[in-house]
Amino acid sequence: MGARVLVATTPGDGHVNPMVPVAQEMVSRGHEVRWYTGKAFRSTVERTGARHEPMRDAHDFGGMPREEAFPQHAGLTGITGMIAGFRDIFIEPAADQMTDLLALLEDFPADVLVTDETFFGAGFVSERTGIPVAWIATSIYVFSSRDTAPLGLGLPPSSSRLGRLRNTVLKQLTDRVVMRDLRRHADVVRDRVGLPRIRKGAFENIMRTPDLYLLGTVPSFEYPRGDMPPEVRFVGPFVSPAPPDFTPPAWWGELDSGRPVVHVTQGTVANDAERLLLPAIRALAAEDVLVVATTGAPLELEPMPANVRVERFIPHHALLPHVDAMVTNGGYGGVNTALAHGVPLVVAAATEEKHEVAARVSWSGAGVHLKKRRLSERDIRRAVRAVLDEPRFRVHAARLRDEYAARDAVVDAVDLIEGLV
């Protein structure tokens, strides 16, 4: 007899999409799956065979631009923007999420909770009820370590004596000064629902360690740590299933013309075209490459240089086998998917979290991290040429591709989740 599985995800593409194949696999194994997330994702949920449970008390911002869902974030950048996002998008809604989930459990007594790592309401429910919770990671590893600097600084790891001293000093500075208000807000939200304070670091102060923390990557793309908890497992990337109805555009045959193909994308959320998309197009206009740009949303981009092809969306499973380099803002899912295809990267991170992704691209040797907030066309052009012309980037990307290919993230994840039941 199958288990009762309650999935809960933040109502955003980057949180819902990695869960899709996991939910499908659980349904295919005979488990009864209900999935609590935003109304905008009802059809996505139902296609997996799970039953959609809409948000009620919790803030449902699914399908809304961030500036509309959180107008108070307008103009915020850097660490300030990261703190505001973590506070308002993930910490503040946790109490209402808990209320919704507890109401669902009265009708559906779940055996296990499966959630993305920033859906903290599920952690509250686990603490209240004892139901085990598994995290499906949608981004980099978030727990602090003696071997790494605090999240958001984009610094490489160091386990040397001096490196650990650096990490300790920076952690104390971050927790006591930079992130002090964020830690206090986590205390307030836990107080609100009657849970004791945890007294941990800035990004760990909101909920206890889950029963499983399933990282959607491989060890070679995450910093080594000597103090990683046993609940953490590497399973490989959670890649969404290919859409069944993709029709290639008329220019598709040009991908095999012999010119290097450069894919430029800003992902599904950060879509300020002047931040990366248009500068990259202008930077590569005179290069002997074919540029395939995806906008993620309708944009007025004409006229385009002769070597540029623009589409709103192209499935990565169809495009990436033809791509020689990818220029991206550092979305975790897109980066892992590119590396799973052996595609080296140029990453111009839009946020502090994405700077951490970009730092791992650089550390792993699979691409270039453009650290400037204001990018020149020359910066982008030089980075793309380096990735195309220097074999070392493709060698490291190919090494990661082979490591990814040895994993079956979905099967391994569901096997581990079943072990909690």
Swiss-Prot record:
Function statement: Catalyzes the penultimate step in the biosynthesis of rebeccamycin, an indolocarbazole alkaloid that inhibits topoisomerase 1. Has a wide substrate range, including staurosporine aglycone, EJG-III-108A, J-104303, 6-N-methyl-arcyriaflavin and indolo-[2,3-a]-carbazole.
Highest rank taxon of the organism: Bacteria
Recorded metabolic or biological pathway in which this protein acts: Alkaloid biosynthesis
Family statement drawn from the similarity comment of this UniProt entry: Belongs to the glycosyltransferase 28 family.
This enzyme's EC code(s): 4.3.3.5
SUPFAM superfamilies associated with the record: UDP-Glycosyltransferase/glycogen phosphorylase
Example of a GO biological process term: antibiotic biosynthetic process
Alphabetized InterPro entries for the sequence: EryCIII-like_C, Glycosyltransferase_28, UDP_glucos_trans
Catalyzed reaction equations: 4'-demethylrebeccamycin + H2O = dichloroarcyriaflavin A + beta-D-glucose
Coiled coil: none
GO molecular function: hexosyltransferase activity; lyase activity; UDP-glycosyltransferase activity
Origin organism lineage: Bacteria, Bacillati, Actinomycetota, Actinomycetes, Pseudonocardiales
Name this polypeptide is given: 4'-demethylrebeccamycin synthase
UniProt keywords, alphabetically: Lyase
Protein species of origin: Lentzea aerocolonigenes
